[in-house]
Amino acid sequence: MVKIRLVRLGAKKRPFYKIVIADSRYPRNGKFIEKIGFFKPLLSIKHPPQICINTLRITHWIKNGAIMSKRVKKLVKIHSYINKKIK
């Protein structure tokens, strides 16, 4: 089964996540098929978290049967809400 999920990177207590397409049998930080975005939760006190998602690729993979994790679903909702406010 193909899933859209997060891969944790970064230093201790300074996480940085890649949003990837991966087979569910692979480990969390293991091999993945495609990188479709990133999420930086801790930039600094003055800056909000940064989210970048390629929505075209997400829709492509969902149409082909990929399943999003709970956290990725929340990030996609936040990303679409931010884009609507900017436009």
Curated annotation (Swiss-Prot):
HAMAP family according to UniProt: Ribosomal_bS16
GO MF term set? structural constituent of ribosome
* Any one Gene Ontology BP term: translation
Name the family the entry cites.
Belongs to the bacterial ribosomal protein bS16 family.
Pfam families from the xrefs?
A: Ribosomal_S16
Q: Record the organism.
A: Buchnera aphidicola subsp. Baizongia pistaciae (strain Bp)
* Protein name in UniProt: Small ribosomal subunit protein bS16
Q: Which UniProt keywords apply?
A: Ribonucleoprotein, Ribosomal protein
SUPFAM superfamilies according to UniProt: Ribosomal protein S16
UniProt-listed Gene3D superfamilies: 3.30.1320.10
Q: Which InterPro entries match?
A: Ribosomal_bS16 (IPR000307), Ribosomal_bS16_dom_sf (IPR023803)
Superkingdom is Bacteria
Q: Keyword Ribonucleoprotein: yes or no?
A: yes
Task: Give the matching PANTHER family.
Answer: 30S RIBOSOMAL PROTEIN S16, SMALL RIBOSOMAL SUBUNIT PROTEIN BS16M
Would you name any one GO CC term?
small ribosomal subunit
